[in-house]
């Protein structure tokens, strides 16, 4: 088999419609476009969303919200998620390797949600007051 000998299967392709080639063809005269009107003319189409002069839907509806540029750089982590990490000294790189935060994240904050039973040392990670109390209660420490 060669690339220049490949052909589609029999019946897989159809001849294109030949419009405007006489009344016997079924698509003669008006060529399937009907009589008169903008859509029957050559070049007679309007842009997407055009509603004949009526205010288009995308302009009638109000603009809403925005895409935060910093949202992807910040992440929050639960106390219970710290429990699953095998390492005791935790920094942002360890969290990325463990798959707990995305690779684009540069700021992490631990929130007091869930329980923690092992002592961990956090480096360069922010914590809430409740999370700080819970970590220090089990013998952990926090360094900035």
From Swiss-Prot:
GO BP annotations of the record are: translation
Query: Which residue intervals make up region (Disordered)?
Result: 20-49
Gene3D superfamilies, per database record: 3.100.10.10
Q: Name one GO cellular component term.
A: cytosolic large ribosomal subunit
Record field: compositional bias (Gly residues): 21-31
Q: Which cysteines are joined by disulfide bonds?
A: none
Identify the keywords attached in UniProt to this record, alphabetized.
Ribonucleoprotein, Ribosomal protein, RNA-binding, rRNA-binding
Coiled coil regions in record: none
GO molecular function, one example? Answer: structural constituent of ribosome
UniProt-listed SUPFAM superfamilies: Ribosomal proteins L15p and L18e
Subunit notes for this chain? Part of the 50S ribosomal subunit.
Q: Any idea what job this protein has?
A: Binds to the 23S rRNA.
The UniProt family comment states: Belongs to the universal ribosomal protein uL15 family.
Entry protein name: Large ribosomal subunit protein uL15
Query: What organism, scientifically named, is this protein from?
Result: Neisseria meningitidis serogroup A / serotype 4A (strain DSM 15465 / Z2491)
């Amino acid at each position: 088999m060669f690339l220049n000998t490949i052909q589609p299967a029999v019946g897989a392709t159809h001849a294109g419609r030949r419009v405007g080639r006489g009344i016997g063809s079924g698509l003669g005269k008006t060529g399937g476009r009907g009589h008169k009107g903008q859509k029957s003319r050559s070049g007679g189409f309007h842009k997407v969303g055009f509603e004949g002069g009526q205010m288009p839907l995308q302009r009638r509806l109000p603009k809403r919200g925005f895409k935060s540029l910093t949202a992807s750089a910040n992440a929050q982590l639960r106390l219970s998620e710290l429990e699953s990490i095998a390492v005791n000294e935790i920094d942002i790189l360890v969290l990325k390797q463990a798959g707990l935060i995305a690779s684009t994240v540069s700021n992490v904050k631990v929130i007091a949600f869930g329980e923690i039973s092992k002592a961990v040392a956090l480096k360069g990670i922010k914590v809430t007051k409740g999370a700080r109390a819970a970590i220090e209660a089990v013998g952990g420490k926090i360094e900035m």
